[in-house]
Swiss-Prot record:
Listed PANTHER family: PELOTA, PROTEIN PELOTA HOMOLOG
Subcellular location: Cytoplasm
Annotated keywords: Cell cycle, Cell division, Cytoplasm, Metal-binding
InterPro entries registered for this protein in UniProt: eFR1_2_sf (IPR042226), eRF1_1_Pelota (IPR005140), eRF1_2 (IPR005141), eRF1_3 (IPR005142), Pelota/DOM34_N (IPR038069), Ribosomal_eL30-like_sf (IPR029064), Transl-rel_pelota (IPR004405)
Source species of the chain: Danio rerio (Zebrafish)
Annotated protein name in UniProt: Protein pelota homolog
Entry-linked SUPFAM superfamilies: Dom34/Pelota N-terminal domain-like (SSF159065), L30e-like (SSF55315), Translational machinery components (SSF53137)
GO molecular function, one term: ribosome binding
Gene Ontology biological process terms, A to Z: cell division; nonfunctional rRNA decay; nuclear-transcribed mRNA catabolic process, no-go decay; nuclear-transcribed mRNA catabolic process, non-stop decay; rescue of stalled ribosome; ribosome disassembly; RNA surveillance
Length: 385
């Protein structure tokens, strides 16, 4: 993401102009947008035209519209973002107040205006515009006949390909059908790696499976690389790391990222940091439950006592449409930072973020124990989106 212009007033109102230059930037933009914001961007509009003879036709024209945002739709698989709202600036093709849907496009600038830019949103822009934040981890999570090829970016886990091949069972005295199917499977996974992983960006490729599938695949991969003289694989052999997983399903990625050897190698990545923070929280919950709180009301009380060492909070909560509730989450983040605590904002598109959402989306590891906190009168579930 490129920041073209930023104009924020002292009262925190203002606008920014950004250019999304890769698919992940659409996810960042989705997290910036809120109902009531003003979005100005280039778009295509179908307009009716009347010729001199009176015949009516229609054509598609490119124009720039400014919408008051009403609905925001993000497709996480295609990384497409559509924003629907009403036109709030005069335009030769679209009447004031008319509805339109803008699909934001890569490499086309847009301007977003808000009445209040809070610290969480401004941090998100800083993160999105940091060139160091790229998809530098890839993973192949596999078992016999199934492989998920995944990119782990700082903001999301992207499933790039799923390989499924039926593997017949070994028969007594003959393994031919089984072995041929297994070879077809390994070949398909190899082609998937070459097609979907950018070796110029990826620093590490995790190959994970139960049993010996991962080892057999790596052996096949580099034998084939030598046979086919595939320099791309041979030159990047050191980037491959073999680790254990309980299955070939995508959810096993969490346990892969928890592996101490993996954690050490990926110590500088945001995704690994999120996984470790959640693991530390669960350990604390088991060993010292008075130092592990979750749920907004309980975590707020810990924050008031200046007790929070690490705050774990899901980005889902900052998309809450109720301004007052969203404000509580923003104040919580600001208070923890002001009092020397660490804030980790989890992406709901990471496995760890999905897990945190099951714990209400907000949790904290405390500096010191706080005795049993009585249940708040309000139902904390009403605080969640």
């Amino acid at each position: 993401m490129k920041l073209v212009h930023k104009d924020i007033e002292k009262d925190n109102a203002g606008q920014v102009t950004l250019i999304p230059d890769e698919a992940e930037d659409m996810w960042h933009t989705y997290n910036l947008l809120q109902v009531g914001d003003s979005l100005r961007a280039s778009t295509i509009r179908k307009v009716q035209t009347e010729s001199s003879t009176g015949s009516v036709g229609s054509s598609r024209v490119r124009t720039t519209l400014t919408l008051c945002v009403e609905t925001i739709d993000f497709d996480s698989q295609a990384c497409q973002l559509r924003v629907k709202g009403t036109n709030i600036q005069e335009n030769q093709y679209v009447k004031m107040g008319a509805y339109h849907t803008i699909e934001l496009e890569l490499n086309r600038k847009f301007t977003l205006a808000k009445k209040v830019w809070d610290s969480v949103v401004l941090d998100r822009i800083e993160q999105a515009c940091d060139p160091a934040q790229k998809a530098d981890v890839a993973a192949v999570v596999m078992q016999e006949g199934l492989a998920n090829l995944v990119l782990v970016t700082p903001a999301m886990t992207l499933l790039r390909a799923k390989v499924e091949v039926t593997i017949p069972r070994k028969r007594k005295g003959s393994c031919t059908q089984h072995d041929k199917a297994l070879e077809r499977f390994y070949e398909a996974v190899m082609q998937g790696i070459l097609r979907h992983f950018n070796f110029d960006v990826v620093k590490c490729i995790l190959v994970a499976s139960p049993g010996f599938v991962k080892d057999q695949f790596i052996s096949y991969l580099f034998k084939e690389a030598v046979r086919q003289d595939c320099k791309l694989l041979l030159e990047n052999r050191s980037k491959f790391m073999v680790v254990h997983s309980s299955s070939g399903h995508k959810y096993s990625l969490k346990e892969v990222l928890c592996d101490p050897a993996v954690t050490a190698r990926l110590s500088d990545t945001k995704a690994a940091g999120e996984v470790k923070a959640l693991e530390d929280f669960y350990k604390m919950l088991q060993q010292e439950p008075d130092r592990a709180f979750y749920g907004l009301a309980h975590v707020e009380r810990a924050s008031e006592a200046l007790a929070i060492d690490i705050l774990l909070i899901s980005d889902t909560l900052f998309r809450h449409q109720d301004v007052a509730t969203r404000g509580r989450y923003v104040r919580l983040v600001d208070n923890v930072k002001e009092n020397g605590g660490t804030v980790r904002i989890f992406s709901s598109l990471h496995v760890s973020g999905e897990q945190l959402n099951q714990l209400s989306g907000v949790a904290a590891i405390l500096r010191f124990p706080i005795a049993d906190v009585s249940e708040p009168e309000e139902n904390s579930s009403s605080d969640e989106d």
